[in-house]
């Protein structure tokens, strides 16, 4: 948090090891978003290096979406996109998020 000058809240389920970092940012300021992205990248990389995952029982979240390939590889994310298209051929379910837009929703 200090290194990136952001506030991070961490909630979770200690009994099963699920931690949910939440980075406080002001979307009106690109610098705030940039710092949040950098902090989340560091958190995601460390979680994966320690044998963890980017997401447990909750969704992936817009800040972690750009790091899906780190965990699942290009082939895994490509499969996710194909499944999304199969179940949502018209792109009406959560349009532009995660498999279609990544960080765009954070900046908008």
Identify the role of each PLM range.
Residues 1-108:
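Conserved glycine-rich FAD pyrophosphate-binding loop
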